[in-house]
Amino acid sequence: MLASVPAPRPAKKDSAASRRKSASKSTGAAVKDGSSARVSASGAAESPKQSCAQVHGVDFQSLVHATQEETLRAVVSSLPTTGLQATQIGRARQLVQQILHHRSPEDRVFLAYTSNMISCGLRDTFTYLARERLVDCFISSAGGIEEDVIKCGGSTLLGQFGQDGRALRRRGINRIGNLLVPNDNYCWFEDFFTPVLESVQEAQRASRWKTHTAPSEIIEAMGAAIAKNHPDTCTSSLVYWCYRNGISVFSPAFTDGSMGDMIYFYNFSHKGLVVDPLEDVVRLRKLAAKERGRNLAIVLGGGLPKHHLLRNVPMDAVVMVTTGLEADGCVSSGVLADDVACGLLREETETVRVQGDATVVFPLMLIAETAATREGAAA
């Protein structure tokens, strides 16, 4: 027969009285020293009031009878003291206001953006900045150039994020997030861009190919072509206003898009067209290397535009907006410590990084401060 195994004795439950007794023993030493159990658990409290602002948000009760403009300004001016990413947006807004409206005449302002910023409605915002000469240099990928020009020939429409890509493709519609671009827009762009390439190659031929053409020169030629051939729609274009106001536009990945396809196929029938991106690296560095003034940047999104700008231009102040995460381990998502470690930023660079969607937060940063909102933020 198997020997019977005694059942395990149930664990003794602590009573409330025993728990209180145990807690009393653990804090006894602190009580004998004249301190409380609370201080023993969390450490001595220090008051940071002298160096830190108090957290508070929007008092909507005081805005019940306010106008829409007054309410909007109250919301925006409350961002710095709201906490979390709202505070970052508020700090970024204050720095953007300084960069755009309170800089010295010798300072240079750079704006780097990803192509989706032009595909969406931020194109109108960038156009305003170029029209008012608030930015001295724009940097983007190929899509950030061609999508701007394409909108002069056809509209980009609002769709939905979940629309079936295969069904749209069969209908001749391209989808960028929840934005829809008909194929006809790209056909229009091909008809527009090919004569630009022909004029560029003719200039190279006239010089007996002693000079090469930089992407920024092709972009400038595109601005001139918009002004000449599409006067009714040119004023909506960032490329046009940069051409008209003499603002540099650089696209280091100029062939990574529809323009690259067209240059590729163009060279089958028109041999000898040379596009030299190194010319633009020299121009960008010369622009940033002036003896007087500071280099100031607004970086919307990451990837190539951010990396190309920051690796070539030593910055004095930078505002960054990104949806990337540090876990990605790429330049698009790098936190400030990563950018300093990689040499993209100097330790002394004044920097504000916002984790958020630029389509939402950047327009808020452009709302000008009044004397009242500045006083409210300071309080």
Swiss-Prot record:
Domain of life the protein comes from: Eukaryota
Effect on the protein upon substituting L344K: Still catalytically inactive
UniProt-listed Gene3D superfamilies: Deoxyhypusine synthase
Positions annotated to bind spermidine: E146, E147, D261, H307, G329, C330, V331, D338, D339, V340, A341, C342, G343, L344
Alphabetized UniProt keyword annotations: NAD
Transmembrane segments: none
Entry's Gene Ontology cellular component terms: cytoplasm
Region (Disordered): 1-48
GO molecular function: deoxyhypusine synthase activity
Bias type Low complexity, positions: 36-47
Keyword NAD: yes
Binding sites annotated in the UniProt record for NAD(+): 115-119, 141-143, 147, 256, 302, 323-324, 357-358
Family: Belongs to the deoxyhypusine synthase family.
Full protein name: Inactive deoxyhypusine synthase
